[in-house]
Swiss-Prot record:
Disease tied to this protein: Hemochromatosis 3: A disorder of iron metabolism characterized by iron overload. Excess iron is deposited in a variety of organs leading to their failure, and resulting in serious illnesses including cirrhosis, hepatomas, diabetes, cardiomyopathy, arthritis, and hypogonadotropic hypogonadism. Severe effects of the disease usually do not appear until after decades of progressive iron loading.
Gene Ontology BP terms: cellular response to iron ion; endocytic iron import into cell; intracellular iron ion homeostasis; iron ion transport; multicellular organismal-level iron ion homeostasis; positive regulation of endocytosis; positive regulation of peptide hormone secretion; positive regulation of protein maturation
Glycosites: N240, N339, N540, N754
Membrane topology: Single-pass type II membrane protein
Keywords, ordered alphabetically: Cell membrane, Cytoplasm, Disease variant, Disulfide bond, Glycoprotein, Membrane, Receptor, Signal-anchor, Transmembrane, Transmembrane helix
Subcellular location: Cell membrane
Protein name per Swiss-Prot or TrEMBL: Transferrin receptor protein 2
Motif (Endocytosis signal): 23-26
Tissue: Predominantly expressed in liver. While the alpha form is also expressed in spleen, lung, muscle, prostate and peripheral blood mononuclear cells, the beta form is expressed in all tissues tested, albeit weakly.
SUPFAM superfamilies per UniProt: PA domain, Transferrin receptor-like dimerisation domain, Zn-dependent exopeptidases
Amino acid sequence: MERLWGLFQRAQQLSPRSSQTVYQRVEGPRKGHLEEEEEDGEEGAETLAHFCPMELRGPEPLGSRPRQPNLIPWAAAGRRAAPYLVLTALLIFTGAFLLGYVAFRGSCQACGDSVLVVSEDVNYEPDLDFHQGRLYWSDLQAMFLQFLGEGRLEDTIRQTSLRERVAGSAGMAALTQDIRAALSRQKLDHVWTDTHYVGLQFPDPAHPNTLHWVDEAGKVGEQLPLEDPDVYCPYSAIGNVTGELVYAHYGRPEDLQDLRARGVDPVGRLLLVRVGVISFAQKVTNAQDFGAQGVLIYPEPADFSQDPPKPSLSSQQAVYGHVHLGTGDPYTPGFPSFNQTQFPPVASSGLPSIPAQPISADIASRLLRKLKGPVAPQEWQGSLLGSPYHLGPGPRLRLVVNNHRTSTPINNIFGCIEGRSEPDHYVVIGAQRDAWGPGAAKSAVGTAILLELVRTFSSMVSNGFRPRRSLLFISWDGGDFGSVGSTEWLEGYLSVLHLKAVVYVSLDNAVLGDDKFHAKTSPLLTSLIESVLKQVDSPNHSGQTLYEQVVFTNPSWDAEVIRPLPMDSSAYSFTAFVGVPAVEFSFMEDDQAYPFLHTKEDTYENLHKVLQGRLPAVAQAVAQLAGQLLIRLSHDRLLPLDFGRYGDVVLRHIGNLNEFSGDLKARGLTLQWVYSARGDYIRAAEKLRQEIYSSEERDERLTRMYNVRIMRVEFYFLSQYVSPADSPFRHIFMGRGDHTLGALLDHLRLLRSNSSGTPGATSSTGFQESRFRRQLALLTWTLQGAANALSGDVWNIDNNF
């Protein structure tokens, strides 16, 4: 110890003056950070007086004060106290290190949450100058609400609904120019348009679609009037069919199975089905699968609100809807429809081979009166007749469909606010612009909200807000033909978007009522939606947030709110095709369908009457929801996506598989590997959480690495074992095809209905063991691949699969 003390004294004698590290506050672009610099001697004294959070001093250097006459007593005392001095210095150093670490970590804890970067500062002052200092979550929220309140949502909805905007029309071309000019006026970083040349189907004015009675001798008789020749089903098969009429409820598979079980076979017949529950495309596909000749689709008055003060759909009005079971241009499946692109001579497998035509309630009433046969089940009954509905069969009908295909240019409009730290990661929000009729609820509301959000965020940027990630605002064309504009864009940039798009928010069908709120979304966004619902006031329950309104009727908020993404949503392709989490939220009318959707009666006036004057408040609530989602997704340091949520999704689906464990065991099959893959995913998600929690928050390289892993979770659930050209919707939970969990479950159910009932049966219509083994293997390896990818680098993967 004496020798150590001597060396320490000699080192001090060799140091001519003291040197210490000073941390000083930095102004300008790095304001709020600490900067390290070396200060020597007296030059550092003034700085230390200004800001020195911690100062460690050893013994004073020799020569720094007048020499003492006698150092021997001091040296002797020093030798006796040396162990204590060293121990004290070590304790001070350790304490200072821990204090400094905590202080450094704490300086970024304004967020109050390990996955939040926008601070939850509850002490916000309303008249804060946004140009001064750091913007906390409450600052951004107040800024957003301040600028959003200055908009003219209702007037934009009214004006947009008055304009003709069928895809490819002159009116749509004029609206496209106006909206692009509106984006340009907001001084965004980038504004541009892309054009696609797509195949759209329209009625032939010279040869309208027709419906006739046919007598027993096969002679065509009286024509049934189709009141509006403009109402049709895009992508219906062309031609004419004749068959007996059968009533098939909503045209779901279970409806058709029930029909067959009651002795009425759909094969070779025309089906009369009701609007609603599933899409037109699904109705026609199901009818085709059950051998029907054609489909007539009508709006059943019993399915809509019977509240006298509210308007109802005219009994002479038919409902428009495309019948392509897919999205995008069905004549270029899997390929973008840019000009001069060469396409293979193949059409989408989702195009039907049977014709379909919408009819009004009045025509349906005439048809239902002619039906004989068994009485329909009670839940199939409607309000068109004074007597019960029958299943049929009824008289023969002849349906003629003469729609024609036209190559049509469509235009998507883009506006971008570039991000500050991660400009190559995009938070995307879009709304359909086109409409077959007035389209007030269908697309005018979404277009108005999109334009208002562009204006609001542009104003926020002018007042100091700079998002971490880029915001991409898009106005889609061709939406009424099956999200054609959005899907073609995704197909054109597929190799880029799954790496760069963080989330997609859809504003389509946002206001269809004001009683119920539904969010059709990916599981990754469920927790974020819950958080944002707590920040937005209910438009029709004063003093309550939307979250409080929801849990008042059902404590299980997600069971009340969350729904799967439907194929007829523009958000569907983002998730099922590209692997980007997406959400589309809607206010509904007390679980009753909005009666005017996809009709010529979807006007501003009818929408206003249905909402009884609350349209501005509900549209404002949607804008607040969307805007606060955008702030969180574009500004948070760590993406607020709940990557662990898919573990619960897998568990729920495994519960459905367990029902068949006994049947599988009898055939020597097991679900063990599915359980193992889920376990690996859960462990990988928890490991990532722990890594994030224990990491240095100011390390931008680590932050970006974590964000990349988080934002690609949805992509991990796209099956890598099927071709995007053959099976574009590769998502194993939300997609369509033999690779999905739904297809595997449907196949398993054949075990119970397999006529042979013996292991190894290979009936083409029954359970096929070889096919099931392949389905199970591909599904399991997709799950395992997701777990491995979430684990990070290959040397971090720890499983015994």
